[in-house]
Regions:
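Cys/His-rich short segments
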Residues: 1-16, 49-87
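Conserved helicase ATPase core of P-loop NTP-dependent helicases/translocases
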Residues: 303-334
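Conserved segment of the helicase C-terminal RecA-like domain
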Residues: 328, 368-402
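SF2 helicase catalytic motif II
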Residues: 25, 33, 47-69, 87-125
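A short beta-strand element within the Helicase C-terminal
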Residues: 338-354, 375-379
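Conserved interdomain linker/interface between the two RecA-like ATPase lobes of SF2 helicase motors
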Residues: 134, 144-152, 157-271
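Conserved helicase ATPase motor motifs in RecA-like P-loop NTPase domains
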Residues: 100-110, 119-151, 164-165
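The feature captures the C-terminal accessory region of ATP-dependent helicases
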Residues: 390-408, 425-545
Length: 545
């Protein structure tokens, strides 16, 4: 390998933002959360090839970025002298691949769609008087009204779908409906069963609905978990089936909220363990299943990311009947974090408590099991919730054609409240990344020095997207941009203005401030992340004396 240690070279993979900017890599893997950094730094332009200088010590320098022409040697730090030389710009990204499109919806999709205006504009190139835009490839397994979603997010009225709609619902290219074998497989040879599995003739996932009228969901959950866990151990002790129990020895519990999951944590520590003893005595099992502390884990937002990675890695550990190595998990409970990214082929058993808010979430979550081996999902419905009861009554019909019930996704990038959050950020981003004198942090003061044509060009690029995605908001969008730019010009007339300074000083005024921080009348709160785009409110209850 050309990157082996013998050659003294390392793999050219960079993780820190500043390193990525300096190297201008060919391939960038990122989350959409990074879009929020567009108005905050001129160095973001390096991701789009906007460089005009190269420093042998610091890497590529962004257009408009202030940088020393040379660096003296630093013997103590082991650094040689370095010079900055001129270089050509790179082409911007030509291909953008977006995975899990169905997740970019609601508030996140609305904010994302706004910033996508800047991303696409920065990826465009002019050739022979023609504007060449980047190509998008987006993937999703569960989406409806994809054309509308693509128009709102990417401003494209036309798109090609692969695979296209077929002639037979039993074959959609990625999924084929295979009838279950009619012959008795109990006495079938192991060779025959293996051949059927290799041919793909096996059931994929089986769904079972449970709705216990007159009982609480917690009671149902206690009884379901205890019988599943104890039965798995009983089967594991049977010599005839001990080699096939692995996919069903670890139970994945799926919950719709942290509150519901928190109740299940307490049940696992107490009630379920006690109920397992009852089940063992009732069915005269040879051995009781005990749930150790290490055998119970959760995958939620309240668990550190490094610990989640360890849990996912250990989930791949198979059941060891001889117990000569570290055992697999007994129960792993989770929220919708596992709906994306948990790819463990050995899993085959899941319990879902309550119908998720979106059917696409239900499909994505339950598809975590039954990948390599036949899977079974137990869905526990709350009889006191009308929606759960309705889904239970239509259980067979719904599960026979789940993809027909996927809801359409929504995104409104230029709605009134969305404009409050991102419209000014789009203006700042395009000015900093496309006008050289506006790029530097102190360039915010130069708003009065650039021509009206340059400002109009920036506005037109945003309004062009508004025409496609939200034509009814065109007038309001133009008016609000004019108001923001006029306010910006008035502030810059009186004093030196910066885009952002970490702390408010008497001699430094800033145009932007972090969203959620204290800000003055002349500062514009701006998102620095899209991880929490919905602002929370604190409610106080006061009782008078």
């Amino acid at each position: 390998c050309m990157f082996s240690l013998k050659t003294g070279r390392t793999i050219p993979v960079y993780l820190v933002d500043e390193e990525i900017y300096a190297k201008c890599p060919t391939v960038i893997i990122s989350t959409v959360d990074k879009f929020a950094r567009l108005p905050w730094s001129e160095r973001v332009g390096l991701l789009f090839g906007r460089t005009d200088r190269y420093c042998s010590r610091c890497g590529h320098i962004a257009i408009g970025e202030k940088h020393a022409g040379r660096h003296n040697a630093d013997v103590a730090a082991g650094l040689e002298k370095a010079e900055t030389v001129a270089c050509k710009q790179f082409y911007p990204p030509e291909l953008i691949i977006q995975d899990e499109l169905h997740l970019i919806t609601g508030p996140l999709g609305t904010i994302y769609g706004g910033y996508e205006t800047v991303v696409e504009e920065m990826c465009c190139i002019e050739k022979n008087g023609k504007k060449i835009r980047p190509k998008y490839i987006v993937s999703t397994a569960t989406i409806r009204n994809a054309g509308e979603q693509i128009k709102f997010l990417y401003g494209r009225n036309e798109f090609a779908q692969f695979p296209p709609s077929g002639f037979d619902t039993r074959d959609s290219f990625f999924i084929k409906e295979v009838p279950l074998p009619t012959e008795n497989l109990v006495d079938a040879s192991e060779e025959k069963i293996s051949r059927m599995i290799s041919d793909g003739k096996k059931p994929f996932r089986q769904y079972a609905g449970i709705c216990a009228s007159g009982q609480s969901v917690k009671t149902t959950l206690i009884r379901l978990y205890s019988i599943i866990l104890q039965t798995a151990l009983d089967i594991a002790k049977d010599p005839e089936y001990e080699d096939y129990i692995d996919p069903y020895y670890t139970l994945i519990g799926y919950f719709n909220s942290i509150r519901e999951l928190g109740g299940a944590v307490r049940l696992l520590d107490d009630d379920i363990a006690s109920r397992i003893r009852v089940v063992k005595n009732k069915y005269n099992s040879s051995e009781q299943r005990y749930l150790s502390f290490e055998g119970k884990k959760e995958i939620t937002s309240r668990i550190p990311s490094w610990e989640i990675a360890q849990v996912l890695e250990k989930l791949a550990i198979s059941y060891d009947k001889n117990k000569k190595k570290q055992g697999c998990y007994d129960v792993v409970i989770a929220t919708n974090m596992i709906a994306v990214g948990m790819d463990v082929d050995r899993l085959g058993l899941m319990s879902v408590v309550g119908q998720p808010k979106q059917n696409s979430e239900y499909i994505q979550a339950t598809s975590r099991v039954g990948r390599q081996h036949p899977g079974i999902i137990f869905t526990v419905y709350n009889p006191y919730r009308p929606r759960d009861l309705s889904n239970y009554e239509n259980f067979v019909g719904f599960h026979s054609q789940m993809y027909r019930y996927v809801e359409g996704t929504t995104a409104t990038p230029f709605a009134a409240r969305a404009r409050d959050r991102v419209l000014h950020a789009l203006v700042v981003s395009l000015l900093r990344l496309q006008v050289e004198t506006m790029a530097d942090n102190g360039g915010a003061s130069n708003i009065n020095d650039i021509s009206d044509e340059q400002i109009k060009d920036i506005k037109d690029k945003i309004l062009e997207r508004v025409k496609i995605t939200a034509p009814s908001s065109y007038v309001d969008t133009e008016k609000e941009m004019d108001e923001f730019i006029n306010t910006w010009k008035n502030i810059a007339k009186d004093e030196k203005l910066y885009y952002f300074v970490p702390t408010i000083a008497d001699d430094k005024k800033r145009l932007l401030t972090y969203y959620g921080e204290y800000y003055g009348d002349k500062e514009k709160p701006t998102l620095s992340s899209m991880r929490d785009v919905e602002q929370s409110s604190t409610v106080f209850y006061w009782e008078g004396v």
